[in-house]
Amino acid sequence: HPSWSLNQPAEILKLHGVDASEVFNSVSNVPWNGCRADSSVILDTVAALGMPLPMVASDDSHFYTGEECTNFIWLQADELNFDAIMDALKKGRFYASQGPKMAVEWDGSTMKVHCSPAKYVVFYTNMVYSAKRVAKGPGITQAEYQPGAQETFLRAEVIDEQGRKAWASPVILNL
C-alpha cells in the first residue's frame, strides 16, 4: 500500500524485482482508515523517474463491512488455469479496476482506450498539462492520446458515472 504506508519514491526506486504495485486498496480508505487508498500519484512519480510498475488493485479486506469485492484485476488469460493466469500476469495482460472495463492499445505513438461507458478517460504523463489529456462523457467508450516529445511515460485511467476507476499500467515512452 504505497500511499497508506507513506512510501517515498526514493525508497521505491531502490527496490529490485518488483512485479507490481498496488494502485488502490479499499481498506486504506474511509470509513476504515484515513484517505490513503489511492497510490496513483506516488506510482506516477516513480514512473516519471524511470520505474514504471504494473498496477494492481485489491480490497485487503479486514472487516467485510463494505470494502470487500470492490477492487480487483481484469486478466486476459487464454484459459482459466494456473499456468495461463501466471502467463498473463508475467506478460502484463491485466489492469486494475473497481468495475470499469478497458482495452488499451499502444502502437508507439498513440494510446487508444476502448472501455465500458465512462464519464472520463484520463491520460497521465510526467507533464503537468496537455490540452487533450481528458476525454469527457457521459457514456464515452473510446479515447486516444498522442504524447509529446517531453513526455516520458503514459498510462490511462477510466472513470465511470459512479466514480469507479480502472487503471492501465504505465508504459515508458521512447519518442
Stretch-by-stretch model annotation:
Residues 2-3:
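Extracytoplasmic mature domains of secreted/periplasmic and thylakoid-lumen proteins
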Residues 6-175:
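Charged catalytic cores and adjacent phosphate/nucleic-acid-binding surfaces used
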